[in-house]
């Protein structure tokens, strides 16, 4: 489930792309988040129109040192609620160590338990050789590469104002020993009502990675706050059976005032 939450908040599709001029994923500096930030999301599943909470995901950031370099240590924890454990127990943890200046990842860790399935993966990115070292070997990667977690925080720093509805923003991600060339399609801005409240939001559709529980194509919709924080506030998507909704339910230590919040629920 946690991987689905990450892919829901920032999803991907295995499609080849040619980089566009001014690709934001190679030229962004952090103005959106700070150390000490915490974001909490509730995951809802729906069947026949009835939503029920299945679990929560929390993202935290701290300022640390990795190989004598200052980094943001981003941790994503996901777990199913106790009543849901009897159906499908989830205890997932994702970590990324991100350079504070370039927002490029140095290390990624995935430690998951999902319904009896266990997996631990460690990825070290060597920026000098453009390689990713994993439990399974050494893999060539592009100079501008992201992992699942770093991509979310990197994307929060995109200046959507310079795009028009329909524009595609490409990037590369390393996942499960493969490089995926992906993009998100910017759809514009609108007001969205969530479990937290009503927001002015930036809207886009990520293309989904084939083989997940999500349907392929541009069927998922993501809304991020239309303010300098650019925090995801809602995600909606159909899945194999029913649909999933992920809503922001709590936040702490945002870098900027949440000025996009129009009213609390």
Question: Predicted regions span which residues?
Answer:
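Leucine-biased recognition of intrinsically disordered, low-complexity hydrophobic segments
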Residues: 15-17
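Hydrophobic, well-structured mid-protein blocks that either form specific transmembrane helices
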Residues: 117-158
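Sec-dependent N-terminal signal peptides
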Residues: 4-13
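Acidic, serine/threonine-rich low-complexity disordered tracts
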Residues: 19-125, 163-265
